[in-house]
UniProtKB/Swiss-Prot annotation:
Catalytic reactions of this protein: (2R)-2-phosphoglycerate = phosphoenolpyruvate + H2O
SMART domains listed in its UniProt record: Enolase_C (SM01192), Enolase_N (SM01193)
Protein name in UniProt: Enolase
Note on cofactor: Binds a second Mg(2+) ion via substrate during catalysis.
Taxonomic source organism: Borreliella afzelii (strain PKo) (Borrelia afzelii)
Pathway annotation: Carbohydrate degradation; glycolysis; pyruvate from D-glyceraldehyde 3-phosphate: step 4/5
Amino acid sequence: MGFHIYEIKARQIIDSRGNPTVEADVILEDGTCGRSAVPSGASTGINEAVELRDGDKSVYMGKGVLKAIENIKNIIAPELEGMSALNQVAIDRKMLELDGTPTKEKLGANAILAVSMATAKAAAKYLGLKVYQYLGAYKANILPTPMCNIINGGAHSDNSVDFQEFMIMPIGAKTFSEAIRMSVEVFHTLKGILHGKGYATSVGDEGGFAPNLKSNEEACEMIIEAIKKAGYEPGKDIAIALDPATSELYDPKTKKYVLKWSTKEELTSEQMVEYWSKWVEKYPIISIEDGMAEEDWDGWKKLTDKIGHKIQLVGDDLFVTNTSFLKKGIEMGVANSILIKVNQIGTLTETFEAVEMAKKAGYTAIVSHRSGETEDTTIADLVVALGTGQIKTGSLSRTDRIAKYNQLIRIEEELETTAEYHGKNVFYSIKQK
């Protein structure tokens, strides 16, 4: 039989930020090859799986991944060679067993994930299926509503905007292709507005603009202006989604949120909740990710009680795609959505488990990229396979982001009349009071 793993190769390649990352090839007995590369994040949750870096400052500023690659070649490969590539759960469990740590610090989540994803791609190719068909079977027909990053701030840029991502969601589109067209039109319109006001139109890590705006509010106002000027209605055709990444603003000693890029103002948890409540009243915001810090569970509970019935509240640093943290959130009634980043947890099997838990609890799930990406488009197939209905994969520029959108356009075409785009109906976790 040709579906057993014959050989696993691994190499160090470069991501979209110019940092090394891991790429793996899983080769089956019949010569079928699956290849996958892993991403990395700029703002990382304290509880997420460990990305193994070499730490040798004289090589790639300490960011080399040769240790992770050696772990694939010397520890993972000898154990997986001969196993069936068609049994993803067994492959992933074997790697978790070999690592034996809660955060995958022994082998590195970057080593484990590269092999996990490459195995799925090899298995799909062996069976003559697309990756989304293999992972999602007959249910894989929902195209996601995209969260398109158009203004960057915080750790993703060098400006005076505190919040990391300002995004648009084309909730009024009828198809995924139309959603991308609408987003592109707003992106280019925004570029023209920024240019006209004398702002720079250079882009950040994820392809959004990073102008030196005067305030956080100005970012929202610029986006609303761009939506209208492009011919769309804010809140109806296109809504705003935010990722303020407030863990980056939180001081655990003082338990205050410091708006360090703009006013230097210090806010208590209660004041931060009020801040977001006012923004939701003022702007057409449909989703806020990491509106409170990952350590501030009480603040998260207050935020959820205050506005969780109005908008989607996404836990990223809070949950780190981990079922134990998600379970705690569900029990406490904290957030109503989880961000799914495969490299935060480290295997496809655990990713599927997290999405299943979220859906059972009535939480939405959003498949996400990282700020350090590659040309790998696995998450585009994954979001269709999981049927989460939402994807966050950057702006409408930079090939590392566009590659995922283009793959989804191809998938929509392949699905023909069975393709579904749910638009504003993806927000089933918003419990109206």
